[in-house]
Amino acid sequence: MENKKENFSEWYNEIITLAELSDKRYPVKGMNVWLPYGWKIMSLIDSIVRRAVDKRNFQEVNFPILIGRSMLEVEFEHIRGFENEIYWVTKGGKEKLEEELALRPTSESAMYPMFSLWIRSHADLPLKIYQIVSVYRYETKHTRSFIRIREIHFFEAHTAHATYEDAEAQMDQYKEIWREISSLLCLPYFYDQRPDWDKFPGAMYTIAFDTVLPSGRSLQIGTIHQYGTNFSKNYDIKYLKEDGTFDYAHQTTYGMSERLLAAIIGIHGDDKGLVLPPDVAPIQVIIIPIPGAGVMEYARDVENTLNSINIRVKVDDRENYTPGYKFNDWEMRGVPLRIEIGEREVKNRTLTISMRNIQGKLTIERSKLIYEVPDTLIRIREKMMENAQKVFKDHVFRATKLEEFNRDGLITAFWCGSKECSDKIEAETEKSVLGFMVDSSETGKCVVCGKNGKMAVFSRSY
């Protein structure tokens, strides 16, 4: 396997192949095949997302994949932002369609004509829905599995509210949702507000969640958008107020994709392979029997006990592979916890355990299994977050002049907000502005022009 530190790009591609996450040999560029192990990880990520939004009164829907050109063109600024990325369906069978149909690049234009039918009065608000679907964008840059592709596994939440204040409260709730998700995936991040020229087409403002990979490049792993009434006015989404007058709904959206999996791979993996957070590991505990009297029966008993407390567990009973091969194989697949069982463990009623991200072995009593394993999985997750935060901090640097932008990582510096200064920074340092740091109230002189500025984040990005 490639060395992660010396050649991150090759290491990343190799680990996806070796761990059997995805197969990019499908004969349409940028549309990869999800393999069972990769799809199971993604499904577990989706489950975390669903739990986080379901308990906050979102409801799941599923909209058609095709959007008529006339529906897209209702919001001109929106379609202009995607016009170079849209796949168009122009024929049905042999007949040319009367109206071109787009494969959804995102779902505003599909959903909002329906919002205008569903929302009639203040009693219908707030409306909070989401879907997890494929979206399609004709990506012309170099494609990379889970990072830059043409068929994207996409979570999108859409809301409508009676007032701007209610919509702003929803934006705050999105941050709360993201904190919950990121804590389980062990992903550190920045909140930053994108500059106007980089916000989502049609939005009042966009806030992104950015992390940094060991290559020093940033990876956008989520965005939230405040639409105000920009879309509701164009799609005629209005409601009857209590005073008998009509007003337009205020809207927000939240988007994430399989880049979450890319971040997990890139941030947590090592030269042995994947390191998976326990909450998204298809197999949380792998049991390796060391051949001997009574070993397999003992291993099955341990497996049944862990199954009974909802631990995802598997006994590796393959006969033609050595224990050493199995150790390496499951390490490469990122299984958080390994249990070794030989004749000694059977005799002593013990278990030998190894954690994927913490060196060394421990011996635990069989009688304490149902307590020790869940506690150990929590310890693994906490250590993963600790390690990830260290890597994140090691790749964030403060700069007071352009000469200090030459490090591999995220740069924080004061910026006045002008496009001219942003362009100068990019031209001289190859780093572009991500946005103003949302959680920072610091002010100072712009690193380029010396005018008053706020703290911003800059990087090379995927």
From Swiss-Prot:
Signal peptide: none annotated. The keyword Cytoplasm applies. Its EC number is 6.1.1.15. InterPro entries: aa-tRNA-synt_IIb, aa-tRNA-synth_II, aa-tRNA-synth_II/BPL/LPL, Anticodon-bd, Anticodon-bd_dom_sf, Pro-tRNA-ligase_IIa, Pro-tRNA-ligase_IIa_arc-type, Pro-tRNA_ligase_II_C. GO terms for biological process: prolyl-tRNA aminoacylation. One of its GO terms (cellular component) is cytoplasm. Catalyzes the attachment of proline to tRNA(Pro) in a two-step reaction: proline is first activated by ATP to form Pro-AMP and then transferred to the acceptor end of tRNA(Pro). Consists of three domains: the N-terminal catalytic domain, the anticodon-binding domain and the C-terminal extension. This is Proline--tRNA ligase. It comes from Thermoplasma acidophilum (strain ATCC 25905 / DSM 1728 / JCM 9062 / NBRC 15155 / AMRC-C165).
